[in-house]
Amino acid sequence: MQRSFYEILGIESDASNIEIKRAYRAMLLETHPDKSGLNYNSNGNNTSSHSVTDIQEAYQTLIDQDLRKKYDEELAESFKKLGFHNAGDGLDLFSLDLFDYSGDEQSFSMNCPRCQITDGFQLTEDALEEHAIDYEGGGYFVLVQCSACSLWLKVLFDVMEE
């Protein structure tokens, strides 16, 4: 999954136009070869994670209120298709079924949908048993934070009887 425009500019989804403009200017300076001190490969290409085109597209979309509203709706829909739903309590719901399971380590892992860090969310079977909370819709849930960013998830699961 590619980074959102908010992540490209390094801002929160409720950022004001002033914050968007500041972030845009800062990101352009960060990618400018004479200003940034970033590394360039032998072809003269910037090796940073965002191109000027990405930064400009993010800015142009987020600074226009109509485009931003449409973008936010599309972003929310894309997260829903991935099984990522807002629970209304500020936490996003994910099913444990979407996590990768390692039988050797008896653990579940998933890349963070926000910062894209590999295995940003990790849960062991012991942690699930120890911290499980009854979920009003049936089954259980645990709260878990990404190891690299501030995103918290509510992970839903059922217990399989052996």
Swiss-Prot record:
<dbReference type="InterPro" id="IPR036869">
    <property type="entry name" value="J_dom_sf"/>
</dbReference>
<keyword id="KW-0408">Iron</keyword>
<comment type="function">
    <text>Required for the first step of diphthamide biosynthesis, the transfer of 3-amino-3-carboxypropyl from S-adenosyl-L-methionine to a histidine residue. Diphthamide is a post-translational modification of histidine which occurs in elongation factor 2.</text>
</comment>
<feature type="binding site">
    <location>
        <position position="146"/>
    </location>
    <ligand>
        <name>Zn(2+)</name>
    </ligand>
</feature>
<protein>
    <recommendedName>
        <fullName>Diphthamide biosynthesis protein 4</fullName>
    </recommendedName>
</protein>
<feature type="binding site">
    <location>
        <position position="112"/>
    </location>
    <ligand>
        <name>Zn(2+)</name>
    </ligand>
</feature>
<dbReference type="InterPro" id="IPR007872">
    <property type="entry name" value="DPH_MB_dom"/>
</dbReference>
<keyword id="KW-0963">Cytoplasm</keyword>
<dbReference type="InterPro" id="IPR053232">
    <property type="entry name" value="DnaJ_C/III_chloroplastic"/>
</dbReference>
<feature type="domain" description="J">
    <location>
        <begin position="4"/>
        <end position="75"/>
    </location>
</feature>
<comment type="pathway">
    <text>Protein modification; peptidyl-diphthamide biosynthesis.</text>
</comment>
<dbReference type="InterPro" id="IPR001623">
    <property type="entry name" value="DnaJ_domain"/>
</dbReference>
<dbReference type="GO" id="GO:0005737">
    <property type="term" value="C:cytoplasm"/>
</dbReference>
<keyword id="KW-0862">Zinc</keyword>
<dbReference type="Pfam" id="PF05207">
    <property type="entry name" value="Zn_ribbon_CSL"/>
</dbReference>
<comment type="similarity">
    <text>Belongs to the DPH4 family.</text>
</comment>
<feature type="binding site">
    <location>
        <position position="115"/>
    </location>
    <ligand>
        <name>Zn(2+)</name>
    </ligand>
</feature>
<feature type="binding site">
    <location>
        <position position="149"/>
    </location>
    <ligand>
        <name>Zn(2+)</name>
    </ligand>
</feature>
<dbReference type="GO" id="GO:0046872">
    <property type="term" value="F:metal ion binding"/>
</dbReference>
<dbReference type="GO" id="GO:0005634">
    <property type="term" value="C:nucleus"/>
</dbReference>
<dbReference type="GO" id="GO:0061077">
    <property type="term" value="P:chaperone-mediated protein folding"/>
</dbReference>
<keyword id="KW-0539">Nucleus</keyword>
<feature type="domain" description="DPH-type MB">
    <location>
        <begin position="90"/>
        <end position="158"/>
    </location>
</feature>
<keyword id="KW-0479">Metal-binding</keyword>
<dbReference type="Pfam" id="PF00226">
    <property type="entry name" value="DnaJ"/>
</dbReference>
<dbReference type="GO" id="GO:0017183">
    <property type="term" value="P:protein histidyl modification to diphthamide"/>
</dbReference>
<dbReference type="InterPro" id="IPR036671">
    <property type="entry name" value="DPH_MB_sf"/>
</dbReference>
